[in-house]
């Protein structure tokens, strides 16, 4: 695992207008999901299957795409659309960043784990 974030990677994220992110599996994403969203860039992301508290909303916090052949054609069109619409792109990127900072930081994950353990222990 990583012990930190390479400054070059961080600079690349924060300098980007658009970040194309693919989840490593269909569940709740990984650290890069939240890193990309916290950059403030517009993030294109394949949807996650696992229901999470405070889910991302397509078109509000990020732009979703699917991995089908037709989905890839639509993805290209969406990227071109947002490249030329600074205000929309920046608004979604800003809202995504705000959403992640409010609901998806490490402390939120820790609290979810504690809540799940407490609930499991209450049922024992």
Segments the model singles out, each with a brief description of its role:
Residues 3, 7-124:
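Catalytic binding pocket for nucleotide-activated donors in carbohydrate/polymer assembly enzymes
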């Amino acid at each position: 695992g990583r012990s930190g974030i390479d400054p070059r990677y961080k600079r690349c994220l924060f300098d980007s207008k658009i970040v194309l992110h693919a989840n490593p599996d269909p569940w709740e994403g990984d650290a890069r999901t939240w890193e990309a969203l916290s950059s403030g860039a517009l993030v294109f992301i394949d949807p996650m299957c696992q229901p999470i508290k405070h889910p991302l909303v397509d078109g509000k916090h990020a732009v979703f795409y699917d991995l089908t052949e037709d989905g890839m054609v639509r993805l290209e069109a969406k990227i071109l659309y947002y490249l030329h619409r600074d205000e929309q792109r920046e608004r979604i990127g800003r809202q995504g960043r705000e959403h992640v900072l409010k609901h998806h930081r490490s402390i939120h994950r820790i609290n979810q784990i504690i809540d799940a353990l407490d609930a499991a222990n209450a049922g024992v």
